[in-house]
Amino acid sequence: EQTDEQTQEAVQEAENFVQTDNILENLKGKRDPEVILQEMSKLPFNMEDLKAYPVYVLSDQFEERSGAELLTEFYEQSKQGNLAQLLMVNYCYNEKWILSYAEFDGSTYYLLRGNIDAGTVEEDYKEMYFHSLNIIEKKEVDQGMSLIMIVFSNQENVSDEQAEQYVK
């Protein structure tokens, strides 16, 4: 009886993986943010399953970007003295922070996966190109799932109120 149960679990796990694989495959080349969000909502969001996939970024301006390109552009703008801000929304699921979308100067980018361990996000990002990091919202959405909103800026000493104003 226990063997039957184990077999059933293995079959279910395989089905979940195939389902994840198909959904991500369906998203390739898609441009409509609504379609992306709808497809993403079907994912079981198991980080182990998703680790095989690169970060895939789509903007609401219908262009594809990689996460690295986005950060490089932010860095270049910052070095040139242009005001630039980057907003990232992460949610915590099964103790893993998963990046769901980023906004850079008004353009929204949907990211299919991130791999940010809970508790290290602030330290990790401060080592990057940002002078200021504000965590302006952190709330439990569901049992075991939290949402965190982070604003990065190339200006120094940005208050949480200023960061919140930018988001509004």
Explain the meaning of each model-derived region.
Residues 2-168:
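Mature, Sec-exported extracytoplasmic domains of Gram-positive
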